[in-house]
C-alpha cells in the first residue's frame, strides 16, 4: 500500500522536504543531559517534581524552531525507557518476588508437564468415557430390536389403551387451541412429579420416560399407537443403564415414525410458537440413519411452474438441504431447455452450514420460463456425480428432481449413465396441484432404485423431503451386524437444555420377516442416541497445570473442533450443528494445516511452531512459540491435541508441610489464610480469588466479593486435606496468598505511590490470586479475577518486558471531567523464575499509572530540559529544536502500543482518546506508520458472533404467499371444480394449522431471544508490530502539506514513540485504517470451494445390497378431497369470511426453529 500523495494550496516556509532520512535542520540538540557514566541511571521521575515547577518556555515564533533531529528523539526515547524501567524495578517487585519464591522453596515442588504422557492419558480417559456410553447404546439397540420383533401389531388399538407421559402435555394444557384441548383430556396421559437435577439443568423424573410427537403427526393414529406400545418396554432398559452408569445423560430413541422416547422424563421445552421439532431432522438422527450422500437437486423452472408451485419448490429444496450433514456433498441446479447451477458452485460441495446458506439464497432467485427439458436436467446431474476430480462423499449417489409433471421418461439418459448397475438413485417429487400424468415420474424413480413423492401443498413438504432416508437405510438394514457401528456426531445444541453436546448413535433395525415368504424386512426402525455434554469431556482435561496459555483441543474427521478454548458460540441453531474448523478457531498458517491433516489421518505427532495468537480481548496479536502434541482417540473419529508454550513445561505444586496438615483444624486457622479475610485488606491490599471449583460444595457467584464470602464460610468447615476439595487448587491458592502478602510487606507498603503518580500496584498468580494495593484501588479494578481469563496476564506471559494496556476507549471518561475517579494505564510484566535448570513463569506483577499525571511527565521527558534545570534559550538570531512540551501546538508526540492503540499524548485534547485505535485519532499518521512497516495487520473471521436481527423488508407490501382468487374466479363455476380451488383450500387448511411457518409471531419478534440475536460472521482486524525495529525518520508526502515524523520502538516495552509535525491542512486526509469489528458475509464461498480444506468421511459406507427390494418405490402424499370440508369452505368464502393474514413463503425458513 503506497502513501497517497496530494497537492494542497497552503505553503510551507523553509526548504523543500524530501521523503528520505535527513541529518536534521537547525542546530544540534542540547548536550546529553545524562552526563558522564558514573553508575546505574536513576529513574528520571526523581527529577521530575522540580522540573515541573519551571515556567514553560514561550515560543518565540515558528522561525526560531526546527523539527527535532533524529538523535534528539533517540535521546528522548532513552529517557522514557529509563523512566519506565526504573518505576517497574522499584514498584513491580519482579526481583523481590523471585527472592520470595526462593525463600519459600520448602512450601512447593516443581512438577513437569510431559506432553506425550499427558495427551495419551487424556485421550484414554475420553475413550473410556465414550466406551461406557457405547455399551449402553448397544444394550438399548439390541433390546429395541427384540421388543419390536416380539410385538404383535394391533389394528384396533385406541389412545386410552396406552399410558405414557406426553412431554408436551403441560404446555398443551396451557394452550386453549391445542389438539388435546380440542378433543378433551385423555385418560392415557400420565401426570408426573419432577425434581431439579443440576446434571440435566432441568427438572426430571427417573421413574419414567417421556414421549415427544411432532405437531404435524396425529398421535392417535394406529401406527403411532403401536409404536408407543412396543417402545414402552425400553423404559426398564433406560433405568438399568443409568443404574450401571449414573453419569449417563439423555438416552433417546428416535423412531422412523417421528416418535421420540427419552429418559429421564422431563417436560418438553416447547417454544411459544408452534413446536416443529421432529427427531428425524436432527443432526444425530440423520447421521445414524444412513451413510454419507452425494446429492444433486434439479428443479424444473419451465413456464408451467409458476406462482404457488414455484414457491413450494423453493421451500422444498430448502427443506431437503436441511436433511444433509457435513459428511454429505450437494449441488443444486435449475432446468428448462437447459440446465444451470442456481449458485456459483459448479460442482458438488460439502453440505456445511455456509454452503447451504448460499444455496438457499440462490434458490429464491429462480424464475419460471421456457419449456420442460428433463434430458438437460438429468444429464447435468449425472455429469456432476461422475466428476471424479473433486472431493465428495463417494457413498450414496442420488438425484432429486422437483417438477410439476411431464411426459418424457428420458430412458435414453438412464441407459447411458445409470443402467444396468443403477448406482445412482433417482427420487422424483411432483409438486403442486395439477392434472398431469404422474406415471413417468413414478417410472423414473422405480427403475432407478428411488422413490416417488407428491407435494401438493405446504403441509406435505417436511414429511416428503425426509422420507428418502428410509430408502437410503435399506442397505444398512440388510447388512445386519456389519452396519451396527456407533458413530459420534459433530457438536450441536441439545434440544432439552444441556448445552453443547455430542451424541453417540446406533441404528435400530426391523428384524421381522415380511409375509409367508420369510423375506427379510429392510426398514430402519429408528436411531438410538446417548448424549455426552462437552463439559463432561472438559472435566477430563487438565485445567490449571497447563498455565494460562496452555490448553487441550480435539477435532473430528471434518477438522471441526470438539474441544477448544475458542469454541464459544454466542448463539446456536437447533437445526444445525456447531461447526467451527480448527483453522478458524485459531489463526491459520501452514504449520497448523499440517497438524490438522495429521490429526484427521489419525496419526500421532509433535511439532514446535512459531505462530500468531489473538489476545483474549481480541485487540492484539502476539507472535509466540507453541508446542503441539497430538494422538487419536481410539474407537472414535476424534483426535486430541495438547498445546503448551515453552514456559509452561513446569508448574508449581504447593506442598503444605506435614506440620500444617497434621493440625486437624479448618483451613481458616492456617496462618496464610488470614490474608484472604477482608479485615486484612486495608493493610495488605485487596485480594480477588479466581472463581474456580476448589470444593464440591462451594457456591459459585459472578460477584467476586460474594464468591470470596462463600469460600471463607466453607473453609471454616474444611480441613486442608478434605476429600471434597481439590487439594491442588486449594493448596496453591493458600500458597500464593502468603507469597503475595510478603510482596506487600517487603516492597509495596513502604513506598509512596503518589510520588510516582501510581494509582495501584498489583500481582496475579497461577494459583488464582490477584492482589491489588492499596485496598481503595480495588474499587476501580476492572480486570477479570481469574488470571487465566485476564488479557493482561496472558499477554505478559507471552511477551518479554513491560506490557502497557490502556483502558478501552468505550469506558474512558475525559480526564478533565474526573472528580474523585481517575483513569489508569496498566503496565505489567511476567515473573520468570529459574530453579536449577527449570524455568517457569508463575506470576505477573505490575503498576497502574495515573493517566493525567503521566501525560504531563511524558511531555517533560520528551523535552529539551536538562538535569541542571536550564531551559534551552531560543531567540531571533538562534535556532533550537521543537520539543513535546513547549511546542505541543506544532509538534505531536504520542506513545502507541503494539496494537495501534493510543497510550499517552502531549495533546491535552487527546487525553479522552487514550485507548482508541490511533487511526481514529490521526488517520494520516497511522496510515504512514502502516505503510512504513511499523505495523502489519491480520484479518480473520469470527464465525461465532451474534448480531441483532435485520429489520424485515417490504413489511407494507409483502408478496403474496398463496394464490388469491378474483371476483371473476368466484363467479366462474368451472373454477370451483378445478385443482386450483382445491389447492387453495388445502393451503388455507394448512395455514390454519401451520400459520407460524409463514408468518413470524409478533409477540415473539418483540421479546424472544431467538429474534433478538442471530448467528452471524464478523470480520476482525488486528494490528501488530512489523519488521522495523530501528529508529526511523520519514515524510508523509502531500506537497506543501507534507509532514515529517519520527518513530522508534521503546526497548523492553510494547510501545512505539512517535513524534510528528501536526497537520497543517485537511486536504492531505488519507484513507482510514479500520480496526473495529465489522459485520461480514465471510470469505467468498465461491472461491473457498475451489480449494476445500482437507477432510475425511466416515470409514463405513452402506449404499448397495444385492438383496434389496426396490419394488416399494412411490406413493402419493396428498389427502383426498373431503366433500364436506370443500362445501363448508366454499360457503364460508361466499359468506364473506374475513381472510387470515397472508402467509409469507419467503419467511418460512426464518420463522421456525427446530
From Swiss-Prot:
Which Gene3D superfamilies is this protein grouped with? Answer: PAS domain (3.30.450.20), von Willebrand factor, type A domain (3.40.50.410)
Q: SMART domains under this entry?
A: VWA (SM00327)
Summarizing the annotation, the consequence of altering residue 302 to A is: Abolishes metal-binding and ability to regulate calcium current
Q: Please list the residue ranges that the record places on the Extracellular side of the membrane.
A: 19-1116
Which GO terms of the cellular component aspect does the record hold? GABA-ergic synapse; plasma membrane; presynaptic active zone membrane; voltage-gated calcium channel complex
**Cache domain boundaries:** 488-577
Which pairs of Cys residues are joined through disulfide bonds in the record? 446-1101
What does the UniProt entry list as the effect of changing residue 300 to A?
A: Abolishes metal-binding and ability to regulate calcium current
Q: Can you name this protein?
A: Voltage-dependent calcium channel subunit alpha-2/delta-2
UniProt source species: Mus musculus
Gene that encodes the chain: Cacna2d2
Amino acid at each position: 500500500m503506497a502513501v497517497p500523495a496530494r497537492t494542497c494550496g497552503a505553503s510551507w516556509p523553509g526548504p523543500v522536504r524530501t521523503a528520505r532520512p535527513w541529518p536534521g535542520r537547525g542546530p544540534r540538540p542540547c548536550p546529553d543531559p545524562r552526563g558522564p557514566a558514573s553508575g546505574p541511571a536513576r529513574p528520571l521521575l526523581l527529577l521530575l517534581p522540580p522540573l515541573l515547577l519551571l515556567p514553560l518556555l514561550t515560543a518565540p515564533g515558528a522561525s526560531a524552531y526546527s523539527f527535532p533531529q533524529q538523535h534528539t528523539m533517540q535521546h528522548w526515547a532513552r529517557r522514557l525507557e529509563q523512566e519506565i524501567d526504573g518505576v517497574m524495578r522499584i514498584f513491580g517487585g519482579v526481583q523481590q518476588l523471585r527472592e520470595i519464591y526462593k525463600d519459600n522453596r520448602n512450601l512447593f515442588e516443581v512438577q513437569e508437564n510431559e506432553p506425550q504422557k499427558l495427551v495419551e492419558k487424556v485421550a484414554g480417559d475420553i475413550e473410556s468415557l465414550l466406551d461406557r456410553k457405547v455399551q449402553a447404546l448397544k444394550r438399548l439397540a439390541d433390546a429395541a430390536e427384540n421388543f419390536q420383533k416380539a410385538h404383535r401389531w394391533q389394528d384396533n388399538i385406541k389412545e386410552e389403551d396406552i399410558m405414557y407421559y406426553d412431554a408436551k402435555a403441560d404446555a398443551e394444557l396451557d394452550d386453549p387451541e391445542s389438539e388435546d384441548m380440542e378433543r378433551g383430556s385423555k385418560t392415557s396421559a400420565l401426570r408426573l412429579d419432577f425434581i431439579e437435577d443440576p446434571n440435566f439443568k432441568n427438572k426430571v423424573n427417573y421413574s419414567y420416560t417421556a414421549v415427544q410427537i411432532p405437531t404435524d403427526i396425529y398421535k392417535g393414529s394406529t401406527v403411532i399407537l403401536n409404536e408407543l406400545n412396543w417402545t414402552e418396554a425400553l423404559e426398564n432398559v433406560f433405568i438399568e443403564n443409568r443404574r450401571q452408569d449414573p453419569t449417563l445423560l439423555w438416552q433417546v430413541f428416535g423412531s422412523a415414525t417421528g416418535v421420540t422416547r427419552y429418559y429421564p422424563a422431563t417436560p418438553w421445552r416447547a417454544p411459544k410458537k408452534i413446536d416443529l421439532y421432529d427427531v428425524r431432522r436432527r443432526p444425530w438422527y440423520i447421521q445414524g440413519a444412513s451413510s454419507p450422500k452425494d446429492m444433486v437437486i434439479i428443479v424444473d423452472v419451465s413456464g408451467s411452474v409458476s406462482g404457488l408451485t414455484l414457491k413450494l419448490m423453493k421451500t422444498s429444496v430448502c427443506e431437503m438441504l436441511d436433511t444433509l450433514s457435513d459428511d454429505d456433498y450437494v449441488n443444486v441446479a435449475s432446468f428448462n431447455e437447459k440446465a444451470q447451477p442456481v449458485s456459483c458452485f459448479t460442482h458438488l460441495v460439502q453440505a456445511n452450514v455456509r454452503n447451504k446458506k448460499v444455496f438457499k439464497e440462490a434458490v429464491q432467485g429462480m424464475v419460471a420460463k421456457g419449456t420442460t427439458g428433463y434430458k438437460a436436467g438429468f444429464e447435468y446431474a449425472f455429469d456432476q456425480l461422475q466428476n471424479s476430480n473433486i472431493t465428495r462423499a463417494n457413498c450414496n449417489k442420488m438425484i432429486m428432481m422437483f417438477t410439476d409433471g411431464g411426459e418424457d421418461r428420458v430412458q435414453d439418459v438412464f441407459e447411458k449413465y445409470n443402467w444396468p448397475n443403477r448406482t445412482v438413485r433417482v427420487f422424483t417429487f411432483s409438486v403442486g396441484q395439477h392434472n398431469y400424468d404422474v406415471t413417468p415420474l413414478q417410472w423414473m424413480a422405480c427403475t432407478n432404485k428411488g422413490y416417488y413423492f407428491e407435494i401438493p401443498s405446504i403441509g406435505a413438504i417436511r414429511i416428503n423431503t425426509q422420507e428418502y432416508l428410509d430408502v437410503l437405510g435399506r442397505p444398512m438394514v440388510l447388512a445386519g451386524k456389519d452396519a451396527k457401528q456407533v458413530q459420534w456426531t459433530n457438536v450441536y445444541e441439545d434440544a432439552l437444555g444441556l448445552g453443547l453436546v455430542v451424541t453417540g448413535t446406533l441404528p435400530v433395525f426391523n428384524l421381522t420377516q415380511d409375509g409367508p415368504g420369510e423375506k427379510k424386512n429392510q426398514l430402519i426402525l429408528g436411531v438410538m442416541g446417548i448424549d455426552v455434554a462437552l463439559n463432561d469431556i472438559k472435566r477430563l482435561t487438565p485445567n490449571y497445570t497447563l498455565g494460562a496459555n496452555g490448553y487441550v483441543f480435539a477435532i473430528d474427521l471434518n477438522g471441526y473442533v470438539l474441544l477448544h478454548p475458542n469454541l464459544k458460540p454466542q448463539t446456536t441453531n437447533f437445526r444445525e450443528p456447531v461447526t467451527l474448523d480448527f483453522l478458524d478457531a485459531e489463526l491459520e498458517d501452514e504449520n497448523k494445516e499440517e497438524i490438522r491433516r495429521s490429526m484427521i489421518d489419525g496419526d500421532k505427532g509433535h511439532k514446535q511452531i512459531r505462530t500468531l495468537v489473538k489476545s483474549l480481548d481480541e485487540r492484539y496479536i502476539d507472535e509466540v512459540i507453541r508446542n503441539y502434541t497430538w494422538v487419536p482417540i481410539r474407537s472414535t473419529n476424534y483426535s486430541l491435541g495438547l498445546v503448551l508454550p515453552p514456559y509452561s513445561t513446569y508448574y508449581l505444586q504447593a506442598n503444605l508441610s506435614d506440620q500444617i496438615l497434621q493440625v486437624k483444624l479448618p483451613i481458616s486457622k492456617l496462618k496464610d489464610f488470614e490474608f484472604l479475610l477482608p479485615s486484612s485488606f486495608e493493610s495488605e491490599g485487596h485480594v480477588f480469588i479466581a472463581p474456580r471449583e476448589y470444593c464440591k460444595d462451594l457456591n459459585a457467584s459472578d460477584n467476586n466479593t460474594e464468591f470470596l464470602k462463600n469460600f471463607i464460610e466453607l473453609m471454616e468447615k474444611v480441613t486442608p486435606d478434605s476429600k471434597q476439595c481439590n487439594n491442588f487448587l486449594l493448596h496453591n491458592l493458600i500458597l500464593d496468598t502468603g507469597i503475595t502478602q510478603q510482596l506487600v510487606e517487603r516492597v509495596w507498603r513502604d513506598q509512596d505511590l503518589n510520588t510516582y503518580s501510581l494509582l495501584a500496584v498489583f500481582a496475579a498468580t497461577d494459583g488464582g490470586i490477584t492482589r491489588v494495593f492499596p485496598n481503595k484501588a480495588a474499587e476501580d479494578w476492572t480486570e477479570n479475577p481469574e488470571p487465566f481469563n485476564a488479557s493482561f496476564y496472558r499477554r505478559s506471559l507471552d511477551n518479554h518486558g513491560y506490557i502497557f494496556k490502556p483502558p478501552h476507549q468505550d469506558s474512558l471518561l475525559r480526564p478533565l471531567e474526573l472528580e474523585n475517579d481517575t483513569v489508569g494505564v496498566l503496565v505489567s510484566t511476567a515473573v520468570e523464575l529459574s530453579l536449577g535448570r527449570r524455568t517457569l513463569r508463575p506470576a505477573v506483577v505490575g503498576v497502574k499509572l495515573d493517566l493525567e499525571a503521566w501525560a504531563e511527565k511524558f511531555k517533560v521527558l520528551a523535552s529539551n530540559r536538562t538535569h541542571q534545570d536550564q531551559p534551552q534559550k531560543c531567540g531571533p538570531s538562534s535556532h533550537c529544536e521543537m520539543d513535546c512540551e513547549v511546542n505541543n501546538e506544532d509538534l505531536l508526540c504520542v506513545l502507541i502500543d503494539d496494537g495501534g492503540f493510543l497510550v499517552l499524548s502531549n495533546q491535552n485534547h487527546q487525553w479522552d482518546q487514550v485507548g482508541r485505535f490511533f487511526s481514529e485519532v490521526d488517520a494520516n499518521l497511522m496510515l504512514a506508520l502502516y505503510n512504513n512497516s511499523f505495523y502489519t495487520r491480520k484479518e480473520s473471521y469470527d464465525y461465532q458472533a451474534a448480531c441483532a436481527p435485520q429489520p424485515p423488508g417490504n413489511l407494507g407490501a409483502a408478496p403474496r404467499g398463496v394464490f388469491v382468487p378474483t371476483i371473476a374466479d368466484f363467479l366462474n363455476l368451472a373454477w370451483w371444480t378445478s385443482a386450483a380451488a382445491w389447492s387453495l383450500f388445502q393451503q388455507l387448511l394448512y395455514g390454519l394449522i401451520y400459520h407460524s411457518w409463514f408468518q413470524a409471531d409478533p409477540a415473539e419478534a418483540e421479546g424472544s431471544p431467538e429474534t433478538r440475536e442471530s448467528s452471524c460472521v464478523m470480520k476482525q482486524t488486528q494490528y501488530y508490530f512489523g519488521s522495523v525495529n530501528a529508529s526511523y525518520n520519514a515524510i508523509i508526502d502531500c506537497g506543501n502539506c507534507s509532514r515529517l515524523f519520527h518513530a522508534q520502538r521503546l526497548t523492553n516495552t510494547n510501545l512505539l514513540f512517535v513524534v510528528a509535525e501536526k497537520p497543517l491542512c485537511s486536504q492531505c486526509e488519507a484513507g482510514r485504517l479500520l480496526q473495529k469489528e465489522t459485520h461480514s458475509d465471510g470469505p467468498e464461498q465461491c472461491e473457498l470451494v475451489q480449494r476445500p480444506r482437507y477432510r475425511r468421511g466416515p470409514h463405513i459406507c452402506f449404499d448397495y445390497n444385492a438383496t434389496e427390494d426396490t419394488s416399494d418405490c412411490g406413493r402419493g402424499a396428498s389427502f383426498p378431497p373431503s366433500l364436506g370440508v370443500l362445501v363448508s369452505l366454499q360457503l364460508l368464502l361466499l359468506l364473506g369470511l374475513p381472510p387470515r393474514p397472508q402467509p409469507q413463503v419467503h419467511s418460512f425458513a426464518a420463522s421456525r426453529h427446530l
